[in-house]
């Protein structure tokens, strides 16, 4: 079993760090914000809570929630313009510090690429380092489903992305950071997992993560030492 001090060393020597987005890099759950914007917040929030607790297979939960929301292309664009996601305090500095150390930073999300790319731009993360679900629209902009071939559409999808990154770039040490069960499940193949509870505490993650933080300042401090 890896000790806490070994985990800290792993983090400081990682050549890639992968962040979950909803409730980790940003304060909100993107799908809940979209539901609120489209007027179906209560039903969708309950489904998100069940999905996060691991009670529903991820793809089933995503399909059900999107069937309720039926977001159009215009609604997604208006959401970003009128209610842009809020970055979690400390994330901008942490990502910037990692990039200064030539660590590759990736965003791996079960949320939507259109929202995650908006977040990536704020953090100077290239879109090639973004893995998320793609919404599909008909030619008139109405909702047409989502791309079910994306690894992030499946339970265990974040682990698949990390496995792909290791194979493609030959990273020696990849760290996964996130708030949810799907993030914790990505280790292995990630070499270490850091649980994050700065926006919402998922008890299952808090109880099982070997390293659990509630403020990104703690990780910044590790890099400065």
From Swiss-Prot:
Single GO cellular component term: cytosol
Cofactor names: Mg(2+)
Molecular-function GO term, any one: identical protein binding
Gene giving rise to this polypeptide: Psph
Active site: 20 (nucleophile), 22 (proton donor)
Family indicated by similarity: Belongs to the HAD-like hydrolase superfamily. SerB family.
Residues engaged in binding Mg(2+): 20, 22, 179
Reactions accelerated catalytically: O-phospho-L-serine + H2O = L-serine + phosphate; O-phospho-D-serine + H2O = D-serine + phosphate
Gene3D superfamilies for the chain: HAD superfamily/HAD-like (3.40.50.1000)
Residues annotated as binding phosphate: 53, 182
Residues reported in the UniProt entry to bind O-phospho-L-serine: 52, 109-111, 158, 182
EC number: 3.1.3.3
Keywords in alphabetical order: Acetylation, Amino-acid biosynthesis, Cytoplasm, Hydrolase, Magnesium, Metal-binding, Serine biosynthesis
Pathway(s) this gene product operates in, as recorded in its UniProt entry: Amino-acid biosynthesis; L-serine biosynthesis; L-serine from 3-phospho-D-glycerate: step 3/3
Species: Rattus norvegicus
Record-listed N-acetylmethionine modification sites: 1
Amino-acid positions noted as binding L-serine in the UniProt annotation, renumbered to this chain: 20-22, 109-111, 158
Cofactor binding notes: Binds 1 Mg(2+) ion per subunit.
Oxidoreductase listed as a keyword: no
Protein name: Phosphoserine phosphatase
GO BP annotations listed: in utero embryonic development; L-serine biosynthetic process; L-serine metabolic process; response to mechanical stimulus; response to nutrient levels; response to testosterone
One Pfam family here: Hydrolase
Functional description taken from the UniProt entry: Catalyzes the last irreversible step in the biosynthesis of L-serine from carbohydrates, the dephosphorylation of O-phospho-L-serine to L-serine. L-serine can then be used in protein synthesis, to produce other amino acids, in nucleotide metabolism or in glutathione synthesis, or can be racemized to D-serine, a neuromodulator. May also act on O-phospho-D-serine.
Subunit structure: Homodimer.
Subcellular location: Cytoplasm, Cytosol
InterPro entries noted in UniProt: HAD-like_SerB, HAD-like_sf, HAD_sf, PSP
